[in-house]
Amino acid sequence: MKFFIDTADVNEIREAHELGLVDGVTTNPSLIAKSGRKFEEVIKEITGIVDGPISAEVVSLDHDGMIREAEELAAIHKNIVIKLPMTPEGLKACTTLTKKGIKTNVTLIFTAMQALLAAKAGATYVSPFVGRLDDISQDGMGIIDDIKTIFDNYGYTAEIIVASVRNPIHVLNAALIGADIATIPYSVMLQLAKHPLTDAGIERFLKDWEKVPK
């Protein structure tokens, strides 16, 4: 399974990349706003760190506006993937961009049927939001399982990006289901490497080492 990092913080991206964990990056307007920097400046810097897909989201809600923004973003770097909202206009834009050879990531997906529509429109990636579904007492990972089954049944090539990841269990379940990608906040990436028995083992080794004659 591939790991994308879900952030626009270039320091987090750089640190995760140095760990060898980053296959790609997902950003959105909210994450860019948190960085306090200009949008294009952030995206360009990210392309210099990670040699993999970098999702950048359009903010227009109409087809023509999305296409205009998408072409501007795609011109920044060959690795840019255009994030589109899961709406009728977004699907229309996805179809147009696919014909132009521009990669797309249809986002804000909350049902398996929405993912199917995105795949039929030619999406390169689909991004179901598991954490937000869990927040309203729905089964986020169950949606991932359904999407995987549908795509396997019909041979869709769109890759599943498990998004809105809140904890290591989300990542574990995504891997068990067979999702292609999990896009993970840096804080959760660090949690994946942690276990209290690992920490206790290191502490014990160090204490034992102190007893070794020098």
Curated annotation (Swiss-Prot):
UniProtKB keywords: Cytoplasm, Pentose shunt, Schiff base, Transferase
Gene Ontology CC: cytoplasm
Taxonomic lineage of the native organism: Bacteria, Pseudomonadati, Thermodesulfobacteriota, Desulfuromonadia, Geobacterales
Protein name per the record: Probable transaldolase
GO MF terms held by the record: aldehyde-lyase activity; transaldolase activity
Keyword Transcription found: no
Family from the record: Belongs to the transaldolase family. Type 3B subfamily.
TM helices/strands, residue ranges: none
InterPro entries: Aldolase_TIM, TAL/FSA, Transaldolase_3B, Transaldolase_3B/F6P_aldolase, Transaldolase_AS, TSA/FSA_arc/bac
One BP term from GO: carbohydrate metabolic process
Source species, domain of life: Bacteria
